[in-house]
Structure formats: structure tokens, C-alpha cells
Amino acid sequence: MATLLVATAVAFVYTEKLKLTPSPILGTRVDKVFSPVCECDTDTATISLRLRRRDRLTVDVIDKDGDSVRTLIQDSPTSGGRVSLHWNGRDDSASIVPEGSYRPRVHLAAERRTIVLPNPIRVDVTPPSVELVSVSPRVFSPDGDGRAEKVVARYRVDERAGVLLYVNGERRVRKRGQQKTGRIEWFGRLDTEPMPPGVYRVSLGARDVAGNLGPRTPEKAVVIRYVALGRDRIEAAAGAPFAVLVLSDAAKVEWRLGKGTGMARPGTLRLRAPLQRGRYTLTVTANGFSARAAVVVREPRP
């Protein structure tokens, strides 16, 4: 009985001494989450710590049951100071560990201490899923006049992730933040220059905090249109009136036909054909972008 009491007292004194002794480890920095399969900047976890003094260091990674899955270094002499290690999410047999939470365990031989760091590392290999809820407007014009300058895509993601917008299969926009719902905008420009008129295919993707890149959404078509005409060939008698539809979101457009010029609002443009028969070009311009139609003028019927 006396022996047991002595042993208990010794253990108590040792425990109290450990409480009063400064930790041999400080300045711990451990990545919180990563994906060993993402093939990206976050496909490894960094475990960084600072030792107060030289020692022989063993660091392994343990699972939720406290079992070691990977030994990173073993009985390695260190001179103290900063130590940084990297874990690629694989166990000692080079297999990727199951998803879940892991923690670094540090053994200091000279100190005769083993410390489990209170820094969980989450292994996540499941990619996020993003839904493209809507795209509007479907026709826009990035010409700088403040009217219909951009496309807005609204989305939902099944986990917190950064959303990416692709145009014709190429990534054009990366949304800051990691909201599960929101909107992402495309201004129809390459660098600072507006892109040519035409049909463009828009889709979304998402990359989660761990780095997993999810599949892209089905594509939706949007149209960049600065100005367009309802017809590309117009036939009219000399001096006769004719009309052509002008499509543009500009406040006004400028037209030119032969020696005649003028300003008009988009919509139905009503003009008169030149008095001389021949082939002319009708040019309609909005904010520096033009559309053209051939105007064939024939002799008036007798």
C-alpha cells in the first residue's frame, strides 16, 4: 500500500512539473484541410512547428482512434528552431487515407515527451457540385455605355466553394469568397477589350476549400450584340420608302446610306432609297460598332 502511495505521489509531482514547464513546442502552424487528389496547390498539408531546443524528433499522423497512419520523420536529430514537414495524404503503404480528421503527433526523445498537436487536418477528396440556376440577360453589349454591360449567372453549390465561370470552355472569371449561393458576373471582355459579337457558351465550375475541382454545369448560350439589322439585303425602288429593324441597346444609333446620314432610336428604321439605281451599303453604328446591309435600288415601276 505504501509503495502505491509513493508511486502515486511521484506521478502527481511529475504531472504538476509538466504543467509548470514551458511546452517544448511553440509557433505551431498546420493546414486545416487539403485534398491529396486535387493536383493543385493544396494537395499536401504543411505541419510547421518551432522547437525550443535541440532534440531527436519523430512526427507521425494519427487518425481519430489514435492509430498512426503515416510516419513523416523518425528519430531525426534537430538543432531546434523551425521545423516544417509536408504530408501528402498517404499512409505508410503509399495509399490515400480515408476522408476524415487527422492530427500530428510529435515525440521528443530527449524530453521523453509525446505531444498530440491540437490542430486537426481534414482530408477531403469529394469534389463540390455547382448548379447554374439562371443566366441573364441572354443578350448583352459590353461597349461601355452602361446599358446591358454584363451577364449575371446565379448559382448554388452543395458546399462552401469558390465558383469559376467558363466561356467557350476557357476559364474567364473566378469568384472571390466561398458562398454556397450567389452570383458571378462576366463583362464580355478579354483583358480590357470587348469581345466580338457572336454566340458564347457559358458554364460554371467550383473548387472547394480543399482544392477539389467539381464538374462543370451544362452550357448556356449568351449573345454579344452591339448592333444588328433585321435584314442583310434590302430591295427598293429609287426614291421609295423602306424599313429595316435595328437591334441594339444603345440609346441612339447613327445610320449612313449613300450621301445621307442621320440619328435614330433602335427599332424600326424608316428611310428612303437613293434616287439613282445601283447597289448601296446601309451602315448603322452604335457606340463604335457597326452592322451593314446591302441596299439594291431598282428603277421605279412605270
Language-model features, listed with the residues they occupy:
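Hydrophobic membrane-insertion alpha-helices, especially the h-region
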Residues: 1-16
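Flexible, low-complexity linkers/stalks enriched in Thr/Pro that connect modular domains
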Residues: 15-28, 112-133, 212-230, 292-302
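Acidic, glycine-anchored loop motifs typical of Ca2+
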Residues: 32-44, 88-96, 138-150, 190-194, ...
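Short proline/glycine-enriched turn/loop motifs at strand-loop junctions of beta-rich domains
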Residues: 51-56, 156-162, 246-253
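Extracellular Ig-like/FN3 beta-sandwich strand-entry sites
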Residues: 54, 82, 99-103, 160, ...
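Glycine-centered tight-turn motifs at strand-turn-strand junctions
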Residues: 68-97, 170-198, 260-278
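Conserved structural position at the C-terminal beta-strand
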Residues: 106-108, 204-206, 284-286
